[in-house]
């Protein structure tokens, strides 16, 4: 079994961005082709870069945690992402940002460091059975997502500290420069285009205002939900960055195939086996229904194999409605394979009576004659 990205970097699933970066820098230096002659260095270096490329990005990491390693890779390959080919980042580029943190250099990411960013929406696939879809149900689901930091309450700033307005751009996030007839606008170099500055980032969330954890959530599945229904839970998605609004959670419903019923909109179809005696003579038969229990169905005398009998308002419930669909029973007349002596005698008598009736009315011979005329 191949290693997942956390195992490749040697960190836990709850590792912070600082821990990820530290692990990446250590491994990148160890396996970079410019620093070692080991045979498998290039392969390991590619794997390390692929892992860090995903986990350093909050949205990619959330998708990776949600889908799992194999499913995420398949999705990336279909979308054309995640293929680094033979490209090797320069060793100086890898450690440039690392050294600038200590030296106050200008090698800084252009990614916003203080701006509020809305959290990503999440998708959860939930499978239920047909009875649960009929009655409706409360389901507890478990998933990993970014949650608002409970230490800084999403601000990204250390407790007691405030997020200050950038004095270089007055909170605009950009500066303007006049060159002749042209005005050039560029991102503020001091706040990186955000308009605000976090002087002391929160230690728990490293200034992001959120961190990843496993969540348990109770979701309500309404009665009459159909296969493929998407239910939106506002604000239950990824927490926003630095106080940004949370995304939404979308629960996609899949209904498992049923052993007895087939669903057609709000109607239910089922195969109903009956004896040839009941088919001929008619009668009452007990039929199971989706809400539980049984109801009586009248079988008309002379019912044929393949006939369809309807039980009104015994189908599926409809969302936000008191109306129900129907249940349609498809008759399957069963012919006995093993007859007792008495049963055979009775059928022989029935056979003779049937032949005599057809001979008397001439219908049988007329039909045969017409076949040869």
Swiss-Prot record:
Gene Ontology MF: a single term: zinc ion binding
All residue ranges annotated as the J domain in the record: 4-68
Record: residues binding Zn(2+) 2: 166, 169, 188, 191
ZnF segments: CR-type: 136-214
GO CC field: cytoplasm
Free-text cofactor note: Binds 2 Zn(2+) ions per monomer.
Record Pfam families: DnaJ (PF00226), DnaJ_C (PF01556), DnaJ_CXXCXGXG (PF00684)
Residues at which Zn(2+) 1 binds: 149, 152, 202, 205
PROSITE patterns associated with the record: DNAJ_1, DNAJ_2, ZF_CR
CXXCXGXG motif repeats (start-end): 149-156, 166-173, 188-195, 202-209
Cellular compartments annotated: Cytoplasm
GO biological process: chaperone cofactor-dependent protein refolding; DNA replication; protein refolding; response to heat
Cofactor: Zn(2+)
Keywords: Chaperone, Cytoplasm, DNA replication, Metal-binding, Repeat, Stress response, Zinc, Zinc-finger
SUPFAM superfamilies in the cross-refs: Chaperone J-domain (SSF46565), DnaJ/Hsp40 cysteine-rich domain (SSF57938), HSP40/DnaJ peptide-binding domain (SSF49493)
Domain of life (superkingdom): Bacteria
Cited InterPro entries: DnaJ (IPR012724), DnaJ_C (IPR002939), DnaJ_domain (IPR001623), DnaJ_domain_CS (IPR018253), HSP40/DnaJ_pept-bd (IPR008971), HSP_DnaJ_Cys-rich_dom (IPR001305), HSP_DnaJ_Cys-rich_dom_sf (IPR036410), J_dom_sf (IPR036869)
Quaternary structure, from the entry: Homodimer.
Family recorded in the similarity comment: Belongs to the DnaJ family.
The protein's role, per its UniProt record: Participates actively in the response to hyperosmotic and heat shock by preventing the aggregation of stress-denatured proteins and by disaggregating proteins, also in an autonomous, DnaK-independent fashion. Unfolded proteins bind initially to DnaJ; upon interaction with the DnaJ-bound protein, DnaK hydrolyzes its bound ATP, resulting in the formation of a stable complex. GrpE releases ADP from DnaK; ATP binding to DnaK triggers the release of the substrate protein, thus completing the reaction cycle.
Domain notes: The J domain is necessary and sufficient to stimulate DnaK ATPase activity. Zinc center 1 plays an important role in the autonomous, DnaK-independent chaperone activity of DnaJ. Zinc center 2 is essential for interaction with DnaK and for DnaJ activity.
Record-given protein name: Chaperone protein DnaJ
């Amino acid at each position: 079994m191949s290693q997942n990205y956390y195992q490749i970097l040697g960190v836990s699933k709850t590792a912070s961005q600082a821990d990820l970066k530290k692990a990446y820098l250590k491994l990148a230096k160890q396996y970079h082709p410019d620093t070692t002659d080991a045979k498998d260095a290039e392969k390991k270096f590619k794997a390390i870069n692929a892992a860090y490329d995903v986990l350093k990005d909050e949205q990619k990491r959330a998708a990776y945690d949600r889908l799992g390693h194999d499913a995420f890779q398949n999705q990336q390959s279909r979308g054309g992402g995640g293929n680094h080919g033979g490209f090797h980042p320069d060793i100086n580029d890898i450690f440039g940002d690392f050294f600038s943190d200590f030296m106050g250099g200008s090698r800084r990411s252009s990614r916003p460091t203080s701006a509020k960013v809305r959290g990503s929406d999440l998708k959860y696939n939930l499978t239920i059975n047909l009875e649960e879809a009929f009655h409706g149900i409360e389901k507890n689901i478990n998933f990993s997502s970014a949650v608002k930091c409970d230490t800084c309450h999403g601000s990204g700033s250390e407790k007691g500290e405030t997020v200050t307005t950038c004095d270089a751009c007055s909170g605009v996030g950009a500066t303007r420069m006049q060159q002749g007839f042209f005005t050039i606008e560029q991102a503020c170099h001091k706040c990186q285009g955000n308009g605000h500055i976090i002087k002391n980032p929160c230690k728990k969330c490293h200034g992001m205002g959120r961190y990843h954890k496993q969540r348990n959530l109770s979701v309500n599945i309404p009665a009459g939900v159909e296969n493929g229904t998407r239910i939106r839970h506002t604000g239950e998605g990824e927490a926003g960055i630095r106080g940004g609004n949370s995304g939404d959670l979308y629960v996609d419903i899949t209904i498992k195939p049923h052993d007895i019923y087939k669903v057609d909109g709000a109607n239910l179809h089922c195969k109903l086996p009956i004896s040839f005696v009941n088919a001929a003579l008619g009668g009452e038969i007990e039929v199971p229904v989706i809400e539980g229990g049984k109801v009586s169905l009248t079988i008309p005398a002379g019912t044929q194999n393949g006939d369809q009998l309807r039980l009104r308002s015994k189908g599926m419930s409809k969302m936000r409605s008191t109306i129900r669909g129907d249940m349609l029973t498809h008759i399957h007349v069963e012919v006995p394979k093993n007859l007792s002596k008495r049963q055979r005698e009775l059928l022989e008598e029935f056979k003779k009576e049937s032949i005599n009736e057809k001979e008397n009315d001439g219908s049988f011979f007329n039909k045969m004659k017409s076949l040869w005329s």
